[in-house]
Structure formats: C-alpha cells, structure tokens
Amino acid sequence: MHLLGHTLQFLSINPIGIGFGQHAGNLAIMQHGESAKCQAMYEVCWHIFFQGFHVRTHDFFNRQAQKLLVDNGFVVIPAQNPEFFIVYETNRYDGIPNFITTDAMLHNYHLFFNQLLKTVETQYLIPELKKLNTGMLAESQKQYESLKGTAWENAARRNVAFFAVGNRLLDPQAKIPEQVKEEVERELALIEAHQETAVSPVMTMGKSPDVLESLKEDYTQYIPRGHYVKSEELKNYFKTMMWYGRLTFRLKDQDEIRSAVLMTLALNRGENLKNWENIYRTTAFFVGKSDDLGYLDFQRILAEVYGNAVSLKQLATDSSQWELFMKKAAKLRPPAINSIPIFDETIQPDREREIKGFRFMG
C-alpha cells in the first residue's frame, strides 16, 4: 500500500500462516484473530511457517510498536527499503514468497506517467505557453484600442488584464500594461497568498464587487503540488495553467461573454490558435478533454451568426446578431463538474446558471 509517499511491507499473521506484501520505506506487520495476540511477539526472534516456507524474523519492535500490534492487530514501523524492487529481490534470495498487490503496479505506472508529463511540460508546453501569452496579450491590447468608447470596451480591457496575469505568473519579470496594473496586481497578490476564496478583481472589472453575483475564485488551488514543486519554472507553469483553466466567463453575465467572444477572435489571429491547440490537445491527451465551453464552441456559433469573417466593428454595432449569438450560446451544454465557489441552493437555486460559461483552457 502506498501511504504518504512511503512504501509499506505487510505481514499478515494468523494461526495458520503468514502472507507478504512489500512497500518500501516501512514495514507493517498485521495479525488476525485472538490467538495472534500473544507475548511471543516480544521475543528476540520468532519462527513462522507459511505453507512450507520457513521465515526467520529478527526483533525490530520497540515497546510502543509491540503494544500497538497487540492492541490494533497491525503496526507500521520504519524499514530500509526505498523502492519495491529491493524488497522483492531480497525476498528472492531469502526464499520468502512475494505477495504483489495491484498498487505496486499502479505506483510504477504513476511514476512513468508523472515523469513523462513533467518532460513534456518542461521541454514543450512551457515554450508554447510563453508564445501564447505574448500573442494573446498583444492581440487583446489591439482589441482594447479599437473598442474604446463602445459597449465592448470594458470586456476588452478585462482581457488585457486576464492575459497580463497569465503572462506575469509564467514570467515574474514580465511588464504589466499600465491600464490594468491595479487590478492585475491585486489578482496576483491573491494568487500568491493562496489562502482564501474571494471575488476576483479581474473578473469584476468595470463594476462594483458583489459577493453574491460577482465571480469568486478559490485561491487555495494555486498552491503548486506534485512534480510542480521541482523547479520555479514548473511552479510558474502550474499557476498559469490553473489561472487559464479555472476562470469562467459566465453566460449569465453579458460583459463576461463579450470577453469570451473577443478571446475567440484573438485566437484566430496570427499563431495564437496553433499555440493554443498545441497546449490544449496535449494536455487533453494526458488528462482528458474539458467539460466546459471553450474556443471550439464559441467559434462554431460565431460562424453561424456572423459568418467566417466577423469584425470588431460588426460586434460593437449589430445588436440583433449579438442577441442571436446569446440565444444560441444559452443552449450550449453545462459543465459536468463544478469548480466555481457558489452559495448553496437556498441562495443560488439555479446551479446551471451560476456555473455555465467559457474557459480559455478548460
């Protein structure tokens, strides 16, 4: 059994035999039945017969371990085996049978998967993400300049802040655009503190924060874990992907959906879509596709409503087409799993309305 990063060895002691299962790092001895609760366990050494195998085990119990064994039927104590195969090899020389449990196989698979993922992220995905950050931030700034003075200005400004946060998380030396500096710095402070659930400063841009209606984010999710603690580069990648994968532009908020539409258009520019697909398809292969709405969903509806060459001017001036887009978007699927902090059903009874929306990276 894999337990808190250690490997345990199990010996099952009963009146007729003993069974073995090895996990390096600790040795656990388990007993079953009243007859196993005997003071013979205190002896310097003892002998057990297991279907013809003769096993000699030296005393490795202190008084506390002896008491726990008698009281609970099992005890876990330190051993000198850092990996499974060492125990198996030792048992082979000593003539001790191995009881190999499925977790030993799964652990090996996990080690292989983890190393493969880390290699792909370090050598391939991080460089792609840097290019995507640069391209999306630049395109968002162009959109903002073009949409000033329109109903879409705030949505465009939010996108500048959104990608400025992602860019700064991946590259701590990256510059923050002046027009969004205050909101970005407050967002980054919440991410780096990673201590609470709070209203997102970036997602509430252009309106007063409302604890009920504003998008709330669980900032404790930004604590790097697993292989992501191995380097600063991986820590930064983890936080950036968490940011892009968690923030939801909800269908219930028209201004947030404007941001999602502008992101979709920005992805269609230059190399942005290629970089996005390289990241998304690779991560989807490893961990599965997103169940949230994303680029592919919005691009399909945009093409249905506006055609294949929608312009920013068309978005900002044609209200009838925008209304049609919103109606079609409302019919899209809800997410299968919710990760947005919301209140219980007595306060927010329409769960789908609260969580349904667009995510940049799913």
Where are these regions (language model features)?
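Compositionally biased, low-complexity intrinsically disordered regions
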Residues: H6-I13, A24-G25, A36-Q39, F50
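Charge-rich, low-complexity amphipathic helices
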Residues: Q22-G33, E256, M263
